[in-house]
């Protein structure tokens, strides 16, 4: 049987079931097996590994994962795809398709039901563009015991995840993802290898979870509030952004100026110039004056 991810086989499956693509679900099917193999290779899936997929579509990536992994669990929100997946994944007895929105699912419950304790598990997915960041944050914040993620996403979002201080892509998203994971851009994927063709190019990004966050912070929630406030208006200085946007902190510019100076950060700098280490130092100093 030919791989699913070829133009002809994809076309045949779509026509056979009279499937119409829903733009609202970000449905773009990959038709290049080489790209799929790069995704699976970088996930380093072995014969004892597990994989979680989100948005399997007609099963193109699922099929490649099933050939290598011990167990594959795929979350698919679109009921119309279930009979198609029943057919395309019939040769593989190690795949479970769950008809749920991953953002609303109890992922810990699914994880404990489907995988063995201590099993090596990766999240491997061609993520729907419109919910890429909510999915990543849900799985990171809920501390799902996975080794990491190899995910395809809009190139622009991938650039933001991997961005360094001082670049226009760098922002609160870069810091939040790099706080939890090591980020690597595997490759750029042209829009031409999808059906239907999206308006933008994609990128494959690998995120490997750190054993512990990259910096030590006294109050994690407050740390992220400081980061978000610092980027509230990109053209404004740290001083302006923090005095106007940091909730739970006294509206006292003199105090703010003193703390910034004490930790060696010029109040006139902009948020995009600070490293994650500087944000941690700043947050740990500011939290001492937080309003209770």
Curated annotation (Swiss-Prot):
It is an enzyme of class 2 (transferase). CDD domains: AdoMet_MTases. S-adenosyl-L-methionine binds at residues 28, 30, 55, 76, 101, 126. Transmembrane segments: none annotated. GO terms for molecular function: 16S rRNA (adenine(1518)-N(6)/adenine(1519)-N(6))-dimethyltransferase activity; RNA binding. Keywords: Cytoplasm, Methyltransferase, RNA-binding, rRNA processing, S-adenosyl-L-methionine, Transferase. The keyword Transferase applies. GO terms for cellular component: cytosol. Its EC number is 2.1.1.182. It is found in: Cytoplasm. It catalyses: adenosine(1518)/adenosine(1519) in 16S rRNA + 4 S-adenosyl-L-methionine = N(6)-dimethyladenosine(1518)/N(6)-dimethyladenosine(1519) in 16S rRNA + 4 S-adenosyl-L-homocysteine + 4 H(+). PANTHER family: DIMETHYLADENOSINE TRANSFERASE, DIMETHYLADENOSINE TRANSFERASE-RELATED. Belongs to the class I-like SAM-binding methyltransferase superfamily. rRNA adenine N(6)-methyltransferase family. RsmA subfamily. Specifically dimethylates two adjacent adenosines (A1518 and A1519) in the loop of a conserved hairpin near the 3'-end of 16S rRNA in the 30S particle. May play a critical role in biogenesis of 30S subunits. This is Ribosomal RNA small subunit methyltransferase A. The gene is rsmA.
């Amino acid at each position: 049987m030919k791989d699913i991810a070829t133009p002809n086989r994809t076309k045949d499956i779509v026509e056979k079931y009279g499937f119409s693509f829903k733009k609202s679900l970000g449905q773009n099917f990959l038709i290049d097996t080489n790209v799929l193999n790069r995704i699976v290779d970088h996930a380093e899936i072995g014969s004892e590994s597990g994989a979680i997929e989100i948005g399997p579509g007609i099963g193109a990536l699922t099929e490649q994962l099933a050939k290598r992994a011990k167990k594959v669990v795929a979350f698919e929100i679109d009921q119309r795809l279930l009979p198609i997946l029943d057919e395309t994944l019939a040769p593989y007895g190690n795949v479970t398709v769950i008809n749920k929105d991953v953002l609303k699912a109890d992922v810990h419950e699914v994880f404990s039901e489907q995988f063995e304790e201590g099993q090596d598990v990766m999240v491997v997915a061609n993520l729907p563009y419109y919910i890429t960041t909510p999915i990543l944050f849900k799985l990171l914040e809920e501390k799902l015991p996975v080794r990491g993620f190899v995910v395809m996403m809009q190139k622009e979002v991938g650039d933001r995840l991997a961005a360094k201080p001082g670049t226009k892509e760098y922002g609160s998203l870069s810091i939040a993802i790099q706080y939890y994971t090591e980020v690597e851009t595997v490759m750029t994927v042209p829009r031409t290898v999808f059906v239907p063709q999206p308006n933008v190019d994609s990128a494959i990004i690998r995120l490997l979870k750190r054993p512990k966050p990259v910096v030590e912070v006294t109050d994690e929630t407050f740390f992220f509030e400081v980061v978000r406030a610092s980027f509230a208006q990109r053209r404004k200085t740290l001083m302006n952004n923090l005095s106007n946007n940091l909730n739970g902190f006294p509206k006292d510019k003199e105090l703010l100026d003193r703390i910034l100076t004490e930790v060696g950060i010029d109040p006139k700098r902009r948020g995009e110039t600070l490293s994650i280490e500087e944000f941690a130092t700043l947050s740990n100093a500011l939290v001492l004056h937080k309003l209770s």
